């Protein structure tokens, strides 16, 4: 038994390991796998090959001495209880070999560059085009983001840095023009004739293609995004990846990878391109996203936005490039866009700061009795509700909330500063600065109510949140918004109720309005059916 024990297992025999590695390095034409037989807890004395090794928190002194003796570590018995670090001298063969080898491989790892080459902001005309009204033309915010990506790819300074990535749905997002413009990357080139070869925008693959079309693999597509998003640190060559996906199939499926990307200080854009629980309708409940912004809020350096208009998308993308690639701040952006087409207004003067901070006013009133706030597609329902309220002589103001998550972060920061400096003048949160008047506030989004609930501590008056809690239905947008009670009538109902609570409306008035709105008091909770 003693003689057999002295026979090294392959994974512990330097000669065998070297021989296997040498053969692997010199094998051509196929990858090589080395199977190495080893012993769990190798070198730890009595703990060697012990099934409970994983539960051991620390080794006994005797086991440590066995480890020292086995590997000839120069530590005396008088020192060993202190568990000193042992480092070979600089001129030792071990250190010299390590340094020489790492130099040949390009440097030491792990190594993180915190800064890299600073990029220049692209020509402002790329973004200014979307600051204008769409006129009578109805477009979606997904179309707006694709337009920006297309223009960025043409930019002389940044074009080579831009990489669009999709897991499968390029045509769904209206990105087929990029097939011809930049091509789809394939290491082998085009190996087949695509079904649409006779079309103008055919499925063109090439070795020098730029777009990554990864097939139905969100994990693979996100991994490609992470590799590009960390290129600034790994290769000192910042890239600007745009990964577009169904928003339900983003954090829901690859949240662990998203967290890892945040931990690695990734920089880039994630685009949830068909977002909203009522907006991507008819494809089954598993497609209808009502919580991706809640998931994104768990990642500290993820800045998430839910814009309603093309000009908001443009301002956010411009700010992202400025923060991540010019100022070199460690963030990545999650932006939800929608596939619903509607008319987009011109950007209000001076709206940029509010868009970036998380909220800006889009409809004013001299004497508002109620405040309506919304995001994404549901903002249009808030605007419709404002018009309905006007019929009942109720004035309202409307705000576009681009990010409840950022409003919450601002609130937490201000609260903390006030706690740390109790003798200083109390600072106000951005929400408090915007909402000076204490009037009822009605929030409506295409996400769970907890998304809008985040800013409740910073609102002085009544605050009612409407959202899309529950699984929902596979139906039309109009029906779904009525089902979840985030449509214009439901927002109006909430506003009227709040005003009744404030004694602004009488019993007769609220009964009349409820009747005209066809309020069904027996309707079941949307999140329970």
Annotate each language-model stretch with its function.
Residues 1-82, 85-345, 352-354, 405, ...:
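Thiamine diphosphate
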